[in-house]
């Protein structure tokens, strides 16, 4: 009897201990999404591969979305791991997997279709959906004009949702959703006449239109919309709250505006003629001098594509050009600058490139140490064009106006004032055609963007071999004569 009682007591104690252990285990909270990210030390992000979001060039990863999400990862104190999706359905499917990425940063617009899959952040970029057609073809001016047209959009996109709504009022409207294309492909198909129309957001068109000079905006479809990041619908609020706090802070401290200026502040500087001409020269002229740009790049430690962009802005890659003011050669050097840089023959393209690169680096090295990249490069370009003294005057004006004298976004607003007496009379170096360096920098940035895109590793060598397809250039059409400078 005693033994039986003791056995029952031991069992009771064992059951009590087991129950207590299970209860305590249940009380241990599961780490939040944000805590898991910090514990792992990695922020896994999924995006799209395009000029407006994310791509890789010779210097590594770049793109508007990449730059912004990299800053977020840095704020968290973790590494950034980028994954790309072939289409939007795959992107949202991967986002919802327990072992998948925790954040989607891909120029997304919130929609009812995605409501069950994701929750969206505060906005960070305002865009306008636009109907795109090919120049020379019938231009629709409203939704009714879409009926009877061959239209393709990204599968699962907000643009597909828009067309679905329009179809309710316009039953004859037909369109195709494709998961085998990206925005660049859709614009190319319009440019080449494979489809009549597509829908893209204004920022994507701005980044890509220079590659497709025949595409035009038919009309804006609806109001402006906000692009947002997304997290999985089933996740807790921890990461989303941190994202919103970061985006709000980035809006207030100017980070978002600086990124917008860096990627979109100069994209509209090329019109149709400029885009078409540059596309031609990219194939016909650049291959002759690319080796000189690359060789000089190694010596002076400056990106060869930036040197090429400067050269194009200066002479359109024409080595024997001479201006009315006496500057000559591919990099348009003055006699004085050429002598200082050791250039004996300004019409020799190799010497001209070497001299121009050396001078650019001299100017850049003379800038105040407080000016950091990427602004330092834009400041150096402005000084290369207008002179360091006038640039310093513009920085002084910026400071007087309560702006940041170390940010190109602010200083470029002041440069045009150097041509106005009420302003230049108060400066050390006086009058300057201050608008010129603003355009000079904007043009070079645009050329540089294009060169960066077309010289991605997967396209390497195609420019030099003449095999690179530059949209808008008909290879069977004789090259038009460029205007002499």
Swiss-Prot record:
It catalyses: Exolytic cleavage of the (1->4)-beta-glycosidic linkage between N-acetylmuramic acid (MurNAc) and N-acetylglucosamine (GlcNAc) residues in peptidoglycan, from either the reducing or the non-reducing ends of the peptidoglycan chains, with concomitant formation of a 1,6-anhydrobond in the MurNAc residue. The N-terminal domain does not have lytic activity and probably modulates enzymatic activity. The C-terminal domain is the catalytic active domain. GO terms for molecular function: peptidoglycan lytic transglycosylase activity. It is a peripheral membrane protein. This is Membrane-bound lytic murein transglycosylase F. Pfam families: SBP_bac_3, SLT. PANTHER family: MEMBRANE-BOUND LYTIC MUREIN TRANSGLYCOSYLASE F. The active site is at residue 314. The gene is mltF. GO terms for cellular component: cell outer membrane. Murein-degrading enzyme that degrades murein glycan strands and insoluble, high-molecular weight murein sacculi, with the concomitant formation of a 1,6-anhydromuramoyl product. Lytic transglycosylases (LTs) play an integral role in the metabolism of the peptidoglycan (PG) sacculus. Their lytic action creates space within the PG sacculus to allow for its expansion as well as for the insertion of various structures such as secretion systems and flagella. Residues 1-27 form the signal peptide. It comes from Pseudomonas entomophila (strain L48).
